[in-house]
């Protein structure tokens, strides 16, 4: 059983113990720890620390010379010695290759998010929506132009 499946079982146990959803993940985690269903392993603590460091890097912004608020640290998943790892770099010193990879991977994440949104919307429209189908436009060209036009006059 994978770690994710173990955690899903914890949620089922939470419900089976008479706790109802909706609930926060924090409440479920507290219940799991209090009931001895989850203990942090050293690797879990290292992973948690790494996630928090990554979040902090993801949230570091500067204002560039043109006045744009831009993210400073960028991650690219790269294979080295037969293993994939996420490497972070500061865009002010990063090699062009790293930045090109990071930007392309972020674009692919956006495409994946759009695909999932479309599937969710289509499923809702086909299986649960009793009204007019919810429509979504996935061409962001006009959105980007509008945002940039507003920024230019601000």
Predicted regions: what they are:
Residues 1-10, 45-154:
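Phospho-regulated, low-complexity intrinsically disordered regions of nuclear gene-regulatory
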Residues 4, 17-26, 39-46:
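Alpha-helix N-cap/helix-initiation sites
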Residues 32-42, 53-58:
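Short alpha-helix boundary/capping elements
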């Amino acid at each position: 059983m994978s770690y994710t499946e173990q955690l899903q079982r914890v949620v089922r146990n939470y419900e089976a113990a008479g706790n109802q959803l909706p609930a926060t993940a924090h409440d479920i985690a507290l219940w799991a720890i209090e009931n001895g269903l989850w203990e942090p392993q050293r690797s879990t603590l290292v992973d948690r620390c790494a996630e928090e460091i990554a979040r902090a890097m993801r949230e570091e912004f500067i204002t560039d010379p043109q006045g744009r608020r831009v993210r400073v640290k960028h991650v690219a998943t790269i294979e080295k010695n037969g293993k994939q790892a996420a490497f972070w770099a500061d865009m002010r010193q990063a090699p062009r290759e790293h930045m090109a990879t990071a930007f392309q991977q972020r674009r692919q994440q956006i495409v994946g998010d759009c695909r999932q949104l479309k599937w969710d919307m289509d499923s809702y429209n086909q299986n649960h929506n009793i009204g007019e189908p919810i429509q979504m436009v996935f061409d962001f060209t006009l959105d980007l132009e509008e945002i940039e036009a507003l920024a230019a006059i601000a």
